[in-house]
Regions:
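Structured, helix-rich domain cores that form ligand/interaction pockets
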Residues: 1-266, 270-277
Length: 279
């Protein structure tokens, strides 16, 4: 089984104004790890940073923006660092994200402004050329009417394509691309990425806490939002779902949320640094 589901971006804010408390209670990490970045971000004057995890504090409040509290934003690499360094779970083989989601749900002041869920196919279910063709010939069933295909070139050579389902300004968008090509690695690796903002992001967190598993929830969201079809009926809702897409979604339901993925830096080096800094 080579399909996997992982959290690939997370941005949330809470009313708590002390960044050290947020780092300890919500992230399960040591505040001493985070250093002043020397710049502001997302409407905050100060950023404490460790790897690609940014903890923003001292909000630039005015009559429009009040009680900004603390905002935490982690990119894909930051998410992997969080999984590696967080003490929210004792089992190093268990992702700390479900515990973080429980904390966010329990805090009525918490707001999740963005979460990306990556659904990776490394087993050969998805073919980018086939997906591009389906989008261009409108052989897909989705309530999202905005669709686009971005083709990249290296000189005159076509080097890859990215499919977008949903409007750039919407609170929900799907991005499909060749992750192996992006990372410059061998083998098959196609990523279906769910980009959720504001209302959809908060709804996902809410459902994730009560869902049997985050990976099953991700599969349900994918299945609800889009399916690639064979045009074998005049009524699109009765068209046959492509076997390769059905198999991919079925496989997603069977996988576990990935934890402790390899980060783009040496975890051992970080742990040694932590020992040196905080004993």
């Amino acid at each position: 089984m080579k399909c996997q589901v992982l959290v690939d971006w997370l941005t949330f804010s809470v009313k708590e104004k002390d960044p050290a408390i947020v780092i300890q209670e919500y992230l399960g990490m040591e505040p001493e790890l985070f250093q002043d970045a020397g710049y502001g971000l997302l409407g905050y004057n100060r950023v404490l940073r460790f790897s690609d995890i940014c903890v923003c504090c001292e909000g630039r409040e005015n009559k429009f923006f009040k009680d900004m509290g603390v905002c935490v934003s982690m990119s894909g690499n930051g998410c992997r660092t969080f999984e590696t360094m967080s003490k929210l779970t004792r089992d190093k083989g268990t992702s700390p994200f479900p515990v973080l989601f429980q904390h966010l749900r329990a805090d009525e002041s918490a707001n999740v402004s963005r979460i990306d869920i990556a659904c990776d196919d490394q087993d050969g279910y998805l073919n980018m050329e086939q997906i591009v063709e389906k989008v261009q010939t409108n052989e897909l069933n989705s309530r999202m009417t905005k669709r686009s295909v971005i083709v990249s070139y290296d000189g005159t050579r076509r080097s890859g394509s990215t499919v977008y389902i949903g409007a750039p300004s919407s609170d929900f968008r799907i991005r499909i691309y060749d992750k192996a090509l992006e990372e410059g690695v061998e083998g098959h690796w196609v990523r279906v990425e769910l980009v959720m903002r504001q209302k959809n992001a908060n709804a996902f967190i809410e459902q994730a806490v009560s869902a049997p598993s985050i990976w099953k929830l991700a599969a349900q969201v994918v299945n609800d939002k889009i399916s690639f079809i064979e045009r074998d009926d005049s009524n699109i809702s009765r068209c046959t779902v492509c076997e390769w897409w059905r198999e991919f979604v079925d496989e997603l339901e069977a996988v576990r949320l990935v934890a402790r993925c390899v980060v783009q830096h040496s975890v051992e080096r970080i742990e040694n640094w932590v020992d040196a800094q905080i004993g």
